[in-house]
C-alpha cells in the first residue's frame, strides 16, 4: 500500500472572481490552522486572466506540496492547471468529490468555484 505523502506547503491562487473565497480560506482556514502556505495572488477583485495564476501555481507544485486554485466556475483553472505534466487538478463541489479524487486520482491541486461565494462546506473539501 502506498502511504500518503507529507504535504509541506500549500500554494493558493485565484483570479478576480475567486479573490473573495481565496481571502476567506486564507483567513479562516489556512491561517487558523497555521498551515505553511503561499498566496500567489491575485490581490484584489480587479479583472485578471486566470491562466496566468494557474500557471504560476503549477510551476511551484512539487512532490511535497499541494495547490488550491479558484476562479468563477472552477472550470477554467482546472483546464489550465491540467495542461502541466505533473499536475492532477480536480474541480470539487463537496467533501465527497474532494476525498475521492485525492484517494483515487492522487490529485495535487483542488479547484473551486468562487461564484457564487458560498462558505458552507468549503473547509470539508480542504
What residue ranges belong to the model's regions?
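C-terminal binding/interaction regions
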Residues: 3, 11-18, 95-126
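Short active-site oxyanion
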Residues: 9-10, 64-67, 86-88
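Glycine-rich phosphate/diphosphate-binding loop of Rossmann-like nucleotide-binding domains
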Residues: 12-30
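Short helix-loop-beta junction
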Residues: 27-36, 86
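A short beta-strand-loop structural module common to alpha/beta enzyme folds
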Residues: 36-47
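Short, structured active-site "lid" loops
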Residues: 52-73
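Mid-chain, well-packed structural core segment of small domains
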Residues: 69-115
